[in-house]
């Protein structure tokens, strides 16, 4: 919980330091399901992190406009026209928080990008076009997946086997060490941020420490 609060605190400090006086500033969020608005009816507990961001700000001065959508990659978000809709709303002094990676890893051609080439190029596009509109881009890498599964030993007790699953035909059991699944997709945003002199928040590390 401490690390999760640090994530929001980092955003608050970063955004408040440059807010324009006497004018409502909008914080746009673009990304995937980890940030997206969720259905909260009937006691559903799942939340995208951007759903909670407005609580950090006085809506009389700063408004969060969350455009993150389940299943989107840096590629499909552009190709579906979602980025154009955000871009036309950006005014000078607004912020755009950019967070992709989980779905860029997927094999489907309408979503897949490669770190170091197409993934980086899409992130740079978001940054460049935000700045052209007078906005301030904030780049984040993807949060970690809750992946604690390791290859099952040949002999395991019944309790461990109750939590077993199969991945690529290999029996896996739940372990106590978080397994990285993001690889270069978590590193690419760091490189792009340095290259473009863009604000960067290491959400992957923050959520890794939280786990």
Residue locations for each model-derived region?
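Bacterial Sec-dependent signal peptides at the C-terminal "C-region" and cleavage site
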Residues: 3-4, 15-24
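Sec-dependent N-terminal signal peptides
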Residues: 6-11
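Alpha-helical transmembrane segments and their juxtamembrane interfaces
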Residues: 12-15, 42, 146
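Serine-esterase "nucleophile elbow" of acetyl-processing enzymes
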Residues: 20-68, 84-96
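Alpha-helical cap/lid subdomain in secreted, periplasmic
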Residues: 22, 81-211
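Acidic/histidine-rich helix-loop elements
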Residues: 37-47, 68-77, 106, 110-113
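Solvent-exposed, flexible loop/coil residues
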Residues: 53, 73, 81
């Amino acid at each position: 919980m401490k690390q999760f609060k640090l994530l929001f605190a980092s955003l608050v400090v970063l955004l408040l330091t440059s807010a324009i006086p006497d004018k409502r500033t909008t914080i746009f969020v673009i990304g995937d399901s980890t940030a997206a608005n969720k259905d909260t009816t009937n006691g559903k507990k799942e939340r995208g992190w951007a759903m909670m961001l407005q609580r950090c700000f006085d809506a009389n001065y700063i408004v969060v406009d969350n455009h993150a959508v389940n299943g989107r990659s840096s590629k499909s978000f552009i190709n579906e026209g979602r980025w154009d809709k955000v871009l036309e709303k950006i005014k000078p002094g607004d912020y755009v928080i950019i967070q992709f990676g989980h779905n860029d890893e997927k094999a489907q051609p309408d979503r897949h990008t490669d770190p170091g080439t197409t993934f980086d190029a899409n992130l740079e596009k978001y940054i460049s076009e935000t700045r052209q509109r007078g906005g301030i881009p904030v780049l984040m890498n993807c949060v970690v997946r809750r992946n604690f599964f390791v290859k099952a030993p040949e002999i395991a007790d019944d309790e461990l086997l109750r939590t077993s699953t199969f991945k690529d035909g290999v029996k896996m059991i739940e372990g106590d060490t978080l397994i990285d699944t993001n690889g270069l997709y978590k590193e690419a945003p760091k490189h792009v941020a340095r290259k473009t002199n863009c604000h960067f928040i290491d959400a992957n590390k923050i959520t890794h420490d939280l786990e």
